[in-house]
């Protein structure tokens, strides 16, 4: 299923952490391009998919608003000028609707 929201954005847009946290996974996947997972306090986890590059490493501490990745993964669905970034928010293993918590 689809557990997050898709955000249309220009290529090479910086992807920022939504809250302070620690990078717990960062790498390339064949289905989602470069993906970053950030563990936050109180058992929240944010996930950033369809990136063309990653700016942080596993174990790095990040602040809310800090750049963690860059959009623009070539998935065959994106035009050359724009792309899709997927954002997910999880709490204790349950997916949340990000738009209830964050204004995009």
Residue ranges and their predicted role:
Residues 8, 14-18, 48-49, 59-62:
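Small beta-strand-rich domains/subdomains or short beta-sheet motifs embedded
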Residues 11, 27-30, 52-55, 72, ...:
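A generic structural motif
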Residues 58-104:
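Conserved, short, structured surface segments that act as functional micro-motifs
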Residues 1-17, 40, 91:
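Short glycine/threonine/proline-enriched tight-turn/helix- or strand-capping micro-motif at secondary-structure
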Residues 2-4, 18, 31-33, 80-84:
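Extracytoplasmic
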Residues 17-54:
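Zn2+-dependent peptidoglycan hydrolase active-site motif and core
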Residues 4-6, 35-37, 47, 86-88:
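Soluble periplasmic/extracytoplasmic beta-strand elements of cell-envelope proteins
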Residues 16, 22-24, 63, 69-70:
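Hydrophobic beta-strand signal
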């Amino acid at each position: 299923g689809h557990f997050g929201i898709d955000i249309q954005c220009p290529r090479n847009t910086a992807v920022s952490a939504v809250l302070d946290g620690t990078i717990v996974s960062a790498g390339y996947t064949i289905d989602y391009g470069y993906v970053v997972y950030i563990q936050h306090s109180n058992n929240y986890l944010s996930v950033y998919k369809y990136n063309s590059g990653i700016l942080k490493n596993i174990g790095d501490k990040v602040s809310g608003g800090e750049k963690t990745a860059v959009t623009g993964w070539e998935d065959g669905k994106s035009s050359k000028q724009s792309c899709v970034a997927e954002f997910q928010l999880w709490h204790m293993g349950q997916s949340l609707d990000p738009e209830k918590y964050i204004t995009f």
